[in-house]
Curated annotation (Swiss-Prot):
The lineage of its organism: Eukaryota, Metazoa, Chordata, Craniata, Vertebrata. One of its GO terms (molecular function) is enzyme-substrate adaptor activity. Residues 468-522 are annotated as: Interaction with ATF2. Component of the mechanistic target of rapamycin complex 2 (mTORC2), consisting in two heterotretramers composed of MTOR, MLST8, RICTOR and MAPKAP1/SIN1. The mTORC2 core complex associates with PRR5/PROTOR1 and/or PRR5L/PROTOR2. Contrary to mTORC1, mTORC2 does not bind to and is not sensitive to FKBP12-rapamycin. Interacts with MAP3K2. Interacts with ATF2. Interacts with MAPK8. Interacts with GTP-bound HRAS and KRAS; inhibiting their activity. Interacts with IFNAR2. Residues 382-487 form the SIN1-type PH domain. It comes from Ovis aries (Sheep). PANTHER family: TARGET OF RAPAMYCIN COMPLEX 2 SUBUNIT MAPKAP1 (PTHR13335:SF1). Component of the mechanistic target of rapamycin complex 2 (mTORC2), which transduces signals from growth factors to pathways involved in proliferation, cytoskeletal organization, lipogenesis and anabolic output. In response to growth factors, mTORC2 phosphorylates and activates AGC protein kinase family members, including AKT (AKT1, AKT2 and AKT3), PKC (PRKCA, PRKCB and PRKCE) and SGK1. In contrast to mTORC1, mTORC2 is nutrient-insensitive. This is Target of rapamycin complex 2 subunit MAPKAP1.
Length: 522
């Protein structure tokens, strides 16, 4: 241990010791502010004055040279140590080594042995450019694929394939829908067909895409070439079609509807379509007749009898007297219920109660009906839509679409972009079953361009009346069509409505008769 009292030696020793050991540079900052050597060479002119500059003989300001280590510099980057030459050399060697790995050195050697012309010719052999005869025995993969998929070329719905979204999932907005096909065979109709469509497609485009995929997969039976022959209905998860709601509007975009399960249903009333042939059997009974619709002529007469009795009694339980069927031209001869309709060679029968006969007055109606009237009655069960306006008591009329078929009457409001529903109540769609219809009467006919009719139906044990207006021709067609449907369906609601109406009429007649009697006695 040595004791030193010379600040110059101590300062130099500390500077040299901290050149390689002080990474922070704080010692340099502390020691550079108090330089002993500089104070000895240039003592301050006044006490407490430690000037850092002196005036030269020529009057110029000269900077002092600090007596410090060469590694210590007075600059703003005093805390950063520069890399040594050794580190830079090692870094350069490392980069050269990496570059050598990427490069491959090939040593060029002169060819000593001379090769013959034959050997040189074999190295670069000349190829023959003659056209080869086509090999008819082997087909290309494209030809094989085209033969395996002939329906792709003859698919009448190819124009709708552009709405297929299977190749755009993740890049464009698409919608995945499970479509049930009630028109399919009994085994495959239980399984839905998954369709991925573009979100910008309309309902009509989606129907075309379904038909295109259906045809491409080779499903049976074949579809109609006209897309307008089909419509989309809301369906349950098990494939059951929800008939309480009307079909989706074909002009609306598909992203407007949030249904993930739909059903493709064929509509038979579109113009220009080959509709399925409807078979009707006429059952004459006391005070009227009924038209029973059948699918084919293979149906048994027992099924026709059950339908006729059920329609005659309505929603009541089939109990009480038993009935039998007789041919219209063969009275008192019962029809074999186990036989088919095809074996009977007749389309008109009589419903007769057991232990009775037509001679007893059970059936006395044998009127002839005009052929045109029968055709109108048969066509009345086909679906047809009309544009009418509903009349309200406390608000303006509402434009809607009235769809009439043999099973139900659908009332769908027509949404208009100009009409604002901000201050008015929006009309809800209504679906009325044909068994709940009671009457359809012409209320008023002012001119050929304006007429009003009233539709009466049963709702929650109460009779409701709806009033519609349109031109006279449309109103008369609607009234005639609905009345034909009501005549062919002997519903309980209609019978109860007329019975209640008759009771009210009798009470009014009795009240007026008693009033006249009292006035006559006075």
């Amino acid at each position: 241990m040595g004791f030193l009292d010379n600040p110059t030696i101590i300062l130099a020793h500390i500077r040299q010791s901290h050149v390689t050991s002080d990474d922070t540079g704080m010692c340099e900052v502390v020691l550079i502010d108090h330089d002993v050597d500089l104070e000895k060479i240039h003592p301050p002119s006044m006490p407490g004055d430690s000037g850092s500059e002196i005036q030269g003989s020529n009057g110029e300001t000269q900077g002092y040279v600090y007596a410090q280590s060469v590694d210590i510099t007075s600059s703003w980057d005093f805390g950063i140590r520069r890399r040594s030459n050794t580190a830079q050399r090692l870094e350069r060697l490392r980069k050269e080594r990496q570059n050598q790995i990427k490069c491959k050195n090939i040593q060029w050697k002169e060819r000593n042995s001379k090769q013959s012309a034959q050997e040189l010719k074999s190295l670069f052999e000349k190829k023959s450019l003659k056209e080869k005869p086509p090999n008819s025995g082997k087909q290309s993969i494209l030809s094989v694929r085209l033969e395996q998929c002939p329906l792709q070329l003859n698919n009448p719905f190819n124009e709708y394939s552009k709405f297929d979204g299977k190749g755009h999932v993740g890049t464009t907005a698409t919608k995945k829908i499970d479509v049930y096909l009630p028109l399919h065979s009994s085994q495959d109709r239980l399984l839905p067909m998954t369709v991925v469509t573009m979100a910008s497609a309309r309902v009509q485009d989606l129907i075309g895409l379904i038909c295109w995929q259906y045809t491409s997969e080779g499903r049976e039976p074949k579809l109609n070439d006209n897309v307008s022959a089909y419509c989309l209905h809301i369906a349950e998860d098990d494939g059951e079609v929800d008939t309480d709601f009307p079909p989706l509007d074909s002009n609306e975009p598909i992203h407007k509807f949030g249904f993930s399960t739909l059903a493709l249903v064929e509509k038979y009333s579109s113009p220009g379509l080959t509709s399925k042939e409807s078979l009707f059997v006429r059952i004459n009974a006391a005070h009227g007749f009924s038209l029973i619709q059948v699918d084919n002529t293979k149906v048994t007469m027992k099924e026709i009898l059950l339908k006729a009795v059920k329609r005659r009694k309505g929603s009541q339980k089939i109990s009480g007297p038993q009935y039998r069927l007789e041919k219209q031209r063969q009275p008192n001869v019962a029809v074999d219920l186990e036989s088919t309709l095809e074996s009977q060679s007749a389309w008109e029968f009589c419903l007769v109660r057991e232990n009775s006969s037509r001679a007893d007055g059970v059936f006395e109606e044998d009127s002839q009906i005009d052929i045109a009237t029968v055709q109108d009655m048969l066509s009345s069960h086909h679906y047809k839509s009309f544009k009418v306006s509903m009349i309200h008591r406390l608000r303006f009329t509402t434009e809607l679409q009235l769809g009439i078929s043999g099973d139900k009457v659908e009332i769908d409001p027509v949404t208009s972009q100009k009409a604002s529903t901000k201050f008015w109540i929006k009309q809800k769609p209504i679906s009325i079953d044909s068994d709940l219809l009671c009457a359809c009467d012409l209320a008023e006919e002012k001119s050929p361009s304006h007429a009003i009719f009233k539709l009466t139906y049963l709702s929650n044990h109460d009779y409701k009346h709806l009033y519609f207006e349109s031109d006279a021709a449309t109103v008369n067609e609607i009234v005639l069509k609905v009345n034909y449907i009501l005549e062919s369906r002997a519903s309980t609601a209609r019978a109860d409505y007329f019975a209640q109406k008759q009771r009210k009429l009798n009470r009014r007649t009795s009240f007026s008769f008693q009033k006249e009697k009292k006035s006559g006695q006075q």
